[in-house]
């Protein structure tokens, strides 16, 4: 009898549950169908699944090639492509100043929230993830002047010391003595350089990757995993609240606890005068400037805000700079004529083999400038749609189509960099000469107009009020180390026919740039 009752109860329960779940699935299907049919974005072309669910984006982002896919979609569908139920990706350089304006009326979306931290149950938004224009301006104002070119130039001695140590370590490991001739994973060493520069300009002390020659504290690996996580949850921000920001149990990437601890300890040591062994007040670093900002803006900057500033420097200041360096070196080496022209341009610097090229000198090298600009065009550090909410009044596209307020629009720097109306029919090819004037074919006036058009279409560092705050520092690092490496060393790819590997997790990381190094002959 008990067995019969148990079977009967189980059957009855299934009879009740099955219709419930059936009704739930039916309701979801109806909801998706109605949402799809009434969406104001339905008329815009794109993959069918992209119009139904953000899972389409998550799938392709996870594969690490979404920038290439998006470019192919624009070639297929045109300048307007629907990439999610409420998101349209635009290949319209003429709208950059509208969507990414200094007014901030096209607000950042929740896409960026995944890079925030959570402390004592409260989500802490940083300069990158803060979407409110007024709050962002309030956070940025106390430190903005320190990131201008005039603000970062006093940091050049810190960068000089790090470049000098990079050269010493490269010579020890790959050029001199019994280790001469070993293949060098130059991309990895340039990453160590950029991370150590961040430590040097922020705390006056390198983190130690160049000295040890590997990711000894796993911070770089953790940073990569954190970016992999961010790239995925940014496509469907609710996932971040269910995982990393879960109020009950955190399910997320490895935390930046070590970076937080480094930042806190350096702040304590500085305030207590315990870092005099490596900190020289006559060579101020960012921590000095943040403490100064606390005194000047006490209502905005407290110790917690200083830690936030320090962490932004640490987390965001190294990867994109290394990506640009890797791209410039890789594309130059893949094109021997380009590398030869760089060597010729720096031949006068080669006579002083111990020199660390000053930024002013490097900046005045026209072909080096062209190579770096072209490398950033071909391989921007960020290569995803930079989302913004359309304001209430909506957006009228150049072709007359209308996108209502509340929808999301954005542009991908990688896609814009292949727009043939700006860059020409050879937009898919690395050609530094496009940044230079050919006196036999172009007047100065025509060149300046073309240069203006190219600059206006460049979204490498963002634009408007949310332009990358670390742009000047990053470019100083890139110009100085590129000029120094080219002037000092003969560099060739270990496999000239091989290709690097890239993975797009918002930042487009590279690997597989192995080279042979030797000193330049006199």
Question: Where on the chain are the PLM-derived regions?
Answer:
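N-terminal membrane-proximal hinge/A-helix region immediately C-terminal to the signal-anchor transmembrane segment
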Residues: 2-138, 160-165, 193, 219, ...
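Cytochrome P450 heme-binding "Cys pocket" and the immediately downstream C-terminal segment
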Residues: 171-172, 336-339, 453-454, 467, ...
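Cytochrome P450 I-helix active-site segment
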Residues: 49, 156, 160, 180, ...
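Cytochrome P450 heme-thiolate monooxygenase catalytic core
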Residues: 108-120, 154-325
């Amino acid at each position: 009898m008990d067995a019969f009752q148990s079977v009967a109860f189980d059957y009855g329960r299934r009879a009740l549950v099955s219709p419930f779940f059936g009704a739930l699935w039916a309701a979801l299907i109806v909801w998706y169908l109605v949402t799809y049919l009434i969406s104001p974005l339905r008329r815009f072309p794109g993959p069918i699944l992209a119009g139904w669910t953000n899972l389409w984006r998550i799938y392709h982002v996870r594969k690490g090639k979404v920038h290439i896919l998006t470019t192919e979609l624009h070639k297929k569908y045109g300048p307007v492509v629907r990439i999610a139920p409420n998101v349209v990706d635009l290949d319209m350089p003429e709208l950059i100043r509208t969507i990414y304006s200094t007014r901030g009326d096209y607000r950042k979306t929740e896409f960026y929230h995944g890079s925030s931290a959570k402390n004592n149950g409260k989500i802490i938004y940083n300069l990158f993830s803060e979407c409110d224009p007024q709050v962002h301006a309030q956070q940025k104002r106390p430190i903005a002047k320190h990131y201008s070119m005039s603000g970062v130039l006093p940091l050049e001695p810190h960068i000089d010391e790090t470049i000098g140590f990079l050269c010493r370590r490269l010579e020890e490991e790959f050029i001199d003595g019994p280790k001469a001739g070993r293949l060098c994973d130059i991309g990895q060493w340039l990453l160590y350089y950029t991370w150590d520069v961040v430590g040097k300009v922020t705390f006056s002390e390198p983190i130690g990757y160049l000295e040890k020659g590997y990711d000894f504290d796993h911070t770089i690996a953790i940073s990569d995993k954190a970016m992999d996580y961010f790239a995925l949850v940014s496509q469907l921000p609710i996932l971040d609240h269910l995982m990393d920001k879960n109020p009950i149990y955190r399910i997320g990437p490895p935390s930046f606890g070590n970076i937080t601890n480094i930042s806190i300890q350096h702040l304590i040591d500085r305030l207590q005068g315990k870092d005099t062994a490596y900190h020289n007040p006559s060579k101020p670093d960012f921590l000095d400037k943040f403490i100064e900002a606390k005194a000047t803006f006490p209502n905005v900057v407290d110790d917690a805000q200083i830690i936030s500033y320090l962490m932004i420097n640490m987390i965001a200041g190294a990867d994109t700079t290394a990506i640009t360096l890797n791209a410039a070196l890789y594309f130059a080496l893949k094109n021997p004529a380009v590398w030869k022209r760089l060597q010729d341009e720096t031949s006068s610097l080669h006579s002083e083999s111990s020199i660390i090229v000053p930024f002013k000198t490097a900046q005045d090298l026209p072909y080096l400038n062209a190579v770096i600009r072209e490398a950033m065009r071909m391989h921007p550090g960020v290569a995803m749609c930079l989302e913004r909410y359309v304001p209430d009044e909506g957006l009228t596209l150049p072709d007359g189509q209308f996108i209502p307020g509340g929808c999301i629009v954005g542009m991908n720097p990688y896609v814009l960099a292949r727009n043939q109306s700006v860059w020409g029919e050879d937009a898919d090819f690395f050609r530094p000469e496009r940044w230079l004037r050919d006196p036999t074919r172009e007047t100065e006036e025509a060149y300046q107009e073309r240069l203006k058009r190219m600059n206006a279409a460049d979204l490498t560092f963002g634009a408007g009020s949310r332009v990358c705050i670390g742009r000047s520092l990053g470019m100083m690092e890139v110009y100085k180390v590129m000029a120094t490496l080219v002037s000092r060393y003969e560099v060739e790819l270990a496999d000239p026919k091989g290709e690097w590997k890239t993975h797009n997790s918002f930042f487009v990381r590279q690997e597989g740039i192995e080279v042979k190094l030797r000193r330049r002959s006199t």
